[in-house]
Regions:
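PP2C/PPM-type serine/threonine phosphatase catalytic domain
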Residues: 1-169
Length: 169
């Protein structure tokens, strides 16, 4: 398998870039047993600690995924790591000054892709997006987890660290 990875992030209109992204392309037996992993996270703009949440989520996923047993499937490995990361981020918020305001805590969106053999596995929480580029076509592969209050107002419905429970696409 040959994989080329390119990554770029821009802060947009925000004063600080709270995005974090990374990839792991193992060169040893883990390439066959675990595959190639790519992850990205975007902190919520209302929080001063979202950059830390994003960095922890991506770095933790890329490190911990490869520490899971080879007997576990890609889905089981990734889900367990993401759920553990969610628990850790939520606990960080509960122990911090932000414990009563989840919009200020350790919260971020998270999307990851693991490519193993000829299969791409997607794991997604929030409104960061994964697209497939094929020729001149751009196809969105993930669903935004936003709840719309009106045509102009919406809020994030799912994210890492937002609550004790987490539903992962």
């Amino acid at each position: 398998m040959r994989v080329t990875v390119g990554q770029y992030s821009h802060r947009g209109q925000k004063p600080e870039n709270q995005d974090f992204h990374g990839a792991c392309l193992p060169q040893d037996h883990q390439l066959a047993s675990k595959g190639v992993a790519v992850a990205l996270a975007d902190g919520i703009s209302s929080s001063n600690v979202s950059r830390e949440a994003s960095q922890s989520a991506v770095a933790g996923f890329l490190q911990d995924y490869y520490c899971t047993p080879d007997a576990w499937s890609v889905k089981q490995s990734a889900r367990r790591v993401i759920l553990a990361t969610n628990s850790w981020l939520h606990a960080q918020t509960r122990r911090s000054q932000y414990r009563f305001d989840r919009d200020r805590g350790y919260v971020c969106t998270f999307s990851a892709m693991v490519i193993k053999s000829a299969t791409a596995y997607l794991f997604h929480v929030g409104d960061a997006r994964i697209y497939r580029v094929h020729g001149d076509n751009l196809e969105q592969l993930t669903t935004d987890h936003r709840l719309w209050v009106s045509r102009e107002e919406s809020y994030l419905g799912r994210a890492l660290g937002m609550g004790e429970q987490l539903e992962i696409d």
